[in-house]
C-alpha cells in the first residue's frame, strides 16, 4: 500500500510549506481588538456565529505551525468566552486550499524523539479542546484538506465541503515516513470505520469530496458556482460560508444534528468491529499485506496499525499516547528523513528558477505520434495547451490520436473528468501529416526515432517553417543535444526535454541545456513542463545527460550478475527487497532490450571501462532473437497481453549459458549483489555532480527517484550517501574494485566526503 505508491504519490501532496508572517485584516465583520496583532487567523461575527478565517501570509497554502497553533488557541478562547457567540465556522481565505498540513520544518529541527513527541501532544491537546467545544464548530472545506488540516476538520462538530476537483481530503503522512500525529489515528477509525481509515492512512491517497461524503468524512456537499460579477472561486467560497453559517446556527439551535445516519453496510461493519475475533483478523490481514508490500523497508505503516490497535483495544488515552510516542520515533528515522528530503526536493523542482519567459508558449507542436509523442500531447492538451501532433503516416497519426483520447477517456471512467470535459480537452489537439500551422508554433518537441540523422533532418525542416522565436526541443534519452543542435541556424533555441514513459504517469521531466542554449529558452521549457504537471530537473548536456548516464552502469552490472548465474527472478527479488519498485531484470524488459543495447553501446564508447560489467553481446543476442522485452512479449520474461502475470523465458537459458561469466564468491552474496547494483548508480550520480552535469544534489535525488525508481526509502543517491555514510560507500566500492576493476573506482567527490565526515550533500 505504501512502497508501491511512494514514487507516484509524493507529488500529489503540497502538505507542508515554510510560512513567513505578515499582517492581514479581515474587514466585513464585527471584529475584536486583538485582530490587528494576528497574522494567520482572524475572525469576525455574523449574528451569533463567529467566522474564523485561516490565511497564512506570503504563501499559496495554509499550513499549521507554532504561530498558527498559538493564534488558533487564542481565537478559540475568545470565542468560548464571548456569550454573544453561540457557534463558529472555520474557513480558509485561500482559493484551492483549506489547510494543506503541518509545517514539515517543525520536525526537521527536532534532534530527539521526545521533541517530536511533544509536537504531536501539543496538536492532540489543541484538537481535543476543539472536539469538546461547548459551542459547535463547522469546518467549511474548499480545496486541499490534508494531514493536519484533515485532523483539524475531523475535530470539528460538522464538515461541509465544495464538490469540485480541487477539494480533496487525505492523510499523506505515511508518504513522509510518519503518521497522523494530532489525533488522526484515533478519530478516523471512529468516523469512517476501521477498514476505510486503514486504507486512508496506509496509502496516503486523496479522497474526493463526493467520496468523502459517502464515507462519512464529510457531512454535506456544496455545489461550486459559475462565473458572475466575481470569479467562480470567490462566489463559491461566499456560498460555502453562507451555508456553513446557517448550519452552525442550526447546530446551536439544535435544529440540525451533527450525527450522520449510517447505511446498512456501515452499520454491519461497525457491529462486526465490536467482535474481538473480527478485529484481530482485520489487524492480521492488514499487517500481512503491509509487510508484503513494504518488504520491511518503511516502518510507518506498522506503527500506524499499532496506534490504531492501542486506541481500539486499550481506550482513547492509550491510543493518543501510542500515537504521539510512535510519531516521535518515526520523525527521526532515516526513512522519514529520506522521504521528507524528497518532498522538499519536489517543492524546489516545481519552481521556475530561470524566471518568467519573455513569451509564453501558446501553440505547441509535436513531431512523432508514437508512444512518447502521443504521451507528451496528452499531458499538454490536458492542461489547455493548443497542440499540433504531426506524423508521417495516417496509421501512425491515428494510433497516436487514439492513445490521447483513450488516456482522457480513462479519466472519465474514473470520474475524474466528465464526457464534456474530455471532448473539450481533446479539441485542443490537431493531428496532421504536414507542417501546416507550424508558422504559429512557439515550441516544437520532437519525439522521432533515436537517430542523429533523422533528428537533423526534422530540425532543418522545422526551422524552415517556424518563426524565429520558436524553440526546438528534443525528447532524446541519450543523444547529446549539442550534436543535434550542430545543424541549427539558431542553436540558442535548441534544448533537450527528456520525458519518461508512460508520459502521463511518470512525473519527471529532465531538461538539458547546452552552452549555447539561452536562459529564456530554458525558462520557456521549464514553464511548459510545469504547466504539464511535471517535476523538473535541469542538467547540462553530455552523453546520457544525468538519468540515462546513471542507469547505464547500473544495468551493465545487472547484466554481469545475470551472466554470473543469478536467476532473473532472484535478482528482481533482491533489488525490490532493497527498495526498487521494479526488479532489475524486469526493468530491462520495461525499458526495452533494444534501447538498452543502443544506450550501452553509445555510452560505452563515450566512457570506456567505467561503463564495463556485463557483455553487450547478451543484449545483442536477445535483440537478434526478438526478445525486446514487454513490447515484444518476450525478454527475460514472457508476457501475456492483458495479464499482469509473467513467467521466465526459458529460451534465455542457452543465451545466458553461452555467455556465462565466473562468479566471484567473495562478492556474490545476496547483500553484495544488492550493493554492486546500488553503488554503481550512486558513484555515477556523484560524478555527475562533480563534473557539473548536475547543479544540485536535490535535483540528482529527484531525478533518480522519480525518473529511474531509485528506492524512495533511501531518499536518492545523495541522501543515501549522507545517511549511509560516504566512507562505507567508498569501502564497498573498493571491495568491488579489487574484484572487478575500474568500473567500481570511487570518484573524487565521493572520496572527499569519505575523508571528511563533516562534509555532507545536505547540511
UniProtKB/Swiss-Prot annotation:
Phosphoserine sites (modified residues): 231, 316, 419, 647, 650
Enzyme active site: 510 (for hydroxyacyl-coenzyme a dehydrogenase activity)
Residues recorded as bearing N6-acetyllysine in the entry: 46, 60, 129, 166, 214, 249, 289, 295, 303, 326, 334, 350, 353, 406, 411, 436, 460, 505, 519, 540, 569, 644, 664, 728, 735, 759
Residues with the Omega-N-methylarginine modification: 399
Transit peptide start and end: 1-36
MF term (GO), any: enoyl-CoA hydratase activity
Residues flagged as site, Important for long-chain enoyl-CoA hydratase activity: 151, 173
Listed CDD domains: crotonase-like (cd06558)
Annotated GO CC locations: mitochondrial fatty acid beta-oxidation multienzyme complex; mitochondrial inner membrane; mitochondrial nucleoid; mitochondrion
Compartments where found: Mitochondrion; Mitochondrion inner membrane
Pfam families, sorted: 3HCDH, 3HCDH_N, ECH_1
Location, primary (coarse class): mitochondrion
Modified residues (N6-succinyllysine): 46, 60, 166, 213-214, 230, 249, 303, 326, 334, 350, 406, 411, 415, 436, 440, 460, 505, 519, 569, 620, 634, 644, 646, 664, 728, 759
InterPro entries hit by this protein: 3-OHacyl-CoA_DH_CS, 3-OHacyl-CoA_DH_NAD-bd, 3HC_DH_C, 6-PGluconate_DH-like_C_sf, ClpP/crotonase-like_dom_sf, Enoyl-CoA_hyd/isom_CS, Enoyl-CoA_hydra/iso, Fa_ox_alpha_mit
Site (Important for hydroxyacyl-coenzyme A dehydrogenase activity): 498
Binding partners and assembly: Heterotetramer of 2 alpha/HADHA and 2 beta/HADHB subunits; forms the mitochondrial trifunctional enzyme. Also purified as higher order heterooligomers including a 4 alpha/HADHA and 4 beta/HADHB heterooligomer which physiological significance remains unclear. The mitochondrial trifunctional enzyme interacts with MTLN.
Function: Mitochondrial trifunctional enzyme catalyzes the last three of the four reactions of the mitochondrial beta-oxidation pathway. The mitochondrial beta-oxidation pathway is the major energy-producing process in tissues and is performed through four consecutive reactions breaking down fatty acids into acetyl-CoA. Among the enzymes involved in this pathway, the trifunctional enzyme exhibits specificity for long-chain fatty acids.
Family from the record: In the N-terminal section; belongs to the enoyl-CoA hydratase/isomerase family.
Protein's name according to its UniProt entry: Trifunctional enzyme subunit alpha, mitochondrial
Organism ancestry: Eukaryota, Metazoa, Chordata, Craniata, Vertebrata
